Amino acid sequence: ANLVSVITAILSLALSLYLVRSIRALHRKVNRNADRVSKELSGQTGRIKSELADVYHQFEAIEQLLPLLKLSAPLPPSRGWAASPDFLLTLAHVTKSIRPRFTVELGSGTSTLVLAKSGARKIISLDHSPEFGSQTREMLAAHKVRGVEILIHELESYPSGYKWYAKSTLKGLAKIDLLIIDGPPSSTNPDARYPALEHLVPLLSPKATVILDDVYRDEERKLADAIVKALPNHVLT
């Protein structure tokens, strides 16, 4: 009986030690998971705050933009493939400030309308998409805008390996006062907009302004730096 009692006591002690260790291990695991969940929640909260701040920023931009344009028809939706309100507001402010005689835009859309409504005199917009180019033409017609030429042609392969706007659409371009680089889309090539440096920057007028969209991307920042080096006396926005 004494032996049984001793064995029972030993087993009970072993079981107790096992349970204590298991509980401690579980506690550590719970703490690790809690830390991970806390970090994930903190990250999500930060992203949500950032997105809300951007939404508010874009709302402020569209509120400031609309009174500047005096539109006679609805403004198409922005964001997504279309230009963001803050970018459109920049276009409006710059155009009203410098009053360009000749504007070249890479990638047509709502931005084309904003340029025209802000006082750009002659605008040529290059677009590789028949769908988007046609939509822009219809939008301009709805707003009774004139003096804008939408040149639609699929992207063309260049010796450098890039696919860019067709050479035929570049004929006659010279003394560009305002250059908007917002195409081709990066889906065609991460450096899809880089050929503008070679083919359009040399065609700028002495006091031209260059506006480059999507500069949060590495490729666009690289292009911006290259343009700054090529044109130290020009303005890059």
Predicted regions and their residues:
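Conserved SAM-binding loop of SAM-dependent methyltransferases across substrates and taxa
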Residues: 110-120
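Single-pass membrane-anchoring alpha-helices
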Residues: 1-28
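Conserved class I S-adenosyl-L-methionine
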Residues: 98-109
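Class I SAM-dependent methyltransferase Rossmann-like catalytic core
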Residues: 62-98
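S-adenosyl-L-methionine
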Residues: 137-175
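Conserved SAM-binding motif I beta-strand of class I
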Residues: 122-128
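C-terminal substrate-binding/active-site "lid" region of AdoMet-derived donor-dependent transferases
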Residues: 154, 185-237
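Short alpha-helix immediately C-terminal to the canonical SAM-binding loop
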Residues: 133-134
